């Protein structure tokens, strides 16, 4: 295989971990990186790697083969010809041009095609985290300053990340003598070969801890409840996210903290609708206001403003209130509020109102026959007339 994966490192367990330890580590990590719960970049791939590692280490036969050959497939996992392949893998098949030969080269040189394998003792950035923040409609528009608290894996305060008991220090690994790698014999397509792999005692660090820290038990990390100040920018929308650098989990080997991604969940407004920086509001308008025109007060998120309604305004007419929408992110001004009027037809008229409308109809040259009463009323009148 082109890249040798350290499944023990993926699950964060030692090579002599029992089945229960492996199962607990898998459950913890799969919950943490599940794509439905963690939308941070790289979380989905991490989840796949965790599942792959567990599928191998939870199966006694696959684990034994992996421990012996570095592959769950046994010796054929290192460039051996599969059935019906005539002894060669596909040339130029997206693996750097040498197909299965990259797998064999990796046994000698620690990487595909002789490339260098990643140094397991090198500093690595910690995992990213995600935090969902609920906002009201108005908070999303105007922004706010707040504090949030969440659980994360931090550098152990007792040993400062060394994993060693205070007053002691890690010592040179007795197995790899500080190199981080050991030579092992593996069966390949060319027979038994000596190859290099990450030391199973020190995990590639070149150091081993004789006396472990009583707080973190040698991991160098501990769980903490972390609280930080957050400035929510004005104009955020539902589903948008903001990155806070190095507010995630602690790195390994002295690497930096990961990042925290805050995902905003904005509650809908009972009055307004929003699309980007534009805010929409629908208001009722009486028949008289629409016909004669009027000057009315209209609510906006910035406060009430005057709006002139021209005479003869039709239902569904839209008016634009400049600068009364939501702020545009990155300081590009403020959007507008779009007001749509709905002309209301009166449902219940008194005699005076009916008379006025009849006069209006006559003045307009309309011959209107009012439809009075309900169907039940008209039926009653018909029976009365027949007596």
UniProtKB/Swiss-Prot annotation:
Compartment(s) of residence: Cytoplasm
Zn finger (CR-type) start-end: 143-225
Known cofactor(s): Zn(2+)
SUPFAM superfamilies attached to this UniProt entry: Chaperone J-domain, DnaJ/Hsp40 cysteine-rich domain, HSP40/DnaJ peptide-binding domain
Domain notes: The J domain is necessary and sufficient to stimulate DnaK ATPase activity. Zinc center 1 plays an important role in the autonomous, DnaK-independent chaperone activity of DnaJ. Zinc center 2 is essential for interaction with DnaK and for DnaJ activity.
Free-text function comment from the UniProt entry: Participates actively in the response to hyperosmotic and heat shock by preventing the aggregation of stress-denatured proteins and by disaggregating proteins, also in an autonomous, DnaK-independent fashion. Unfolded proteins bind initially to DnaJ; upon interaction with the DnaJ-bound protein, DnaK hydrolyzes its bound ATP, resulting in the formation of a stable complex. GrpE releases ADP from DnaK; ATP binding to DnaK triggers the release of the substrate protein, thus completing the reaction cycle.
Name by which UniProt lists this protein: Chaperone protein DnaJ
Organism: Lacticaseibacillus paracasei (strain ATCC 334 / BCRC 17002 / CCUG 31169 / CIP 107868 / KCTC 3260 / NRRL B-441)
Organism phylogeny: Bacteria, Bacillati, Bacillota, Bacilli, Lactobacillales
């Amino acid at each position: 295989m082109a890249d040798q994966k350290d499944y023990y490192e993926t699950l964060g367990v030692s090579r002599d971990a029992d089945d229960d330890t492996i199962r607990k580590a898998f459950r913890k990590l799969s919950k943490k990186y599940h794509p439905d719960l963690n939308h941070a970049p790289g979380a989905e791939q991490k989840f796949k790697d965790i599942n792959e590692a567990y599928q191998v280490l939870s199966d006694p036969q696959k684990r034994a083969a992996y421990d012996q050959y570095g592959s769950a497939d046994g010796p054929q996992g290192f460039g051996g010809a599969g059935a019906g392949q005539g002894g060669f893998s596909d040339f130029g098949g997206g693996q750097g041009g040498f197909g299965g030969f990259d797998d064999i080269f990796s046994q000698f040189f620690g990487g595909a095609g002789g490339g260098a394998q990643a140094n397991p003792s090198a500093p690595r950035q910690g995992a990213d985290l995600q935090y969902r923040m609920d906002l009201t409609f108005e908070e999303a528009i105007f922004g706010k300053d707040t504090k949030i608290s969440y659980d994360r894996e931090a550098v152990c305060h007792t040993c400062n990340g060394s994993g060693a008991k205070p007053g002691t220090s890690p010592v040179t690994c007795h197995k790899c003598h500080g190199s981080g790698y050991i030579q092992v014999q593996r069966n390949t397509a060319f027979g038994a070969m000596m190859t290099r792999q990450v030391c199973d005692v020190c995990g590639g660090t070149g150091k081993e801890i004789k006396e472990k820290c009583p707080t973190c038990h040698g991991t160098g990390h501990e769980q903490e409840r972390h609280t930080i100040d957050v400035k929510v920018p004005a104009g955020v929308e539902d589903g948008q996210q903001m990155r806070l650098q190095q507010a995630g989990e602690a790195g390994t080997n002295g690497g930096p903290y990961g990042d925290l991604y805050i995902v905003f969940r904005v509650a809908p407004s009972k009055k307004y609708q929003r699309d980007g920086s534009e805010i929409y509001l629908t208001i009722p308008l009486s028949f008289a206001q629409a016909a004669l025109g009027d000057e009315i007060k209209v609510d906006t998120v910035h406060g009430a403003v005057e709006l002139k309604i021209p005479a003869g305004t039709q239902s569904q007419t839209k008016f634009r209130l400049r600068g009364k929408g939501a702020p545009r992110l990155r300081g590009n001004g403020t959007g507008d509020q779009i007001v749509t009027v709905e002309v209301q037809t009166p449902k219940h008229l008194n005699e005076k109102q009916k008379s006025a409308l009849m006069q209006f109809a006559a003045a307009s040259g309309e011959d209107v026959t009012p439809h009075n009463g309900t169907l039940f009323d008209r039926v009653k009148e018909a029976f009365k007339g027949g007596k």
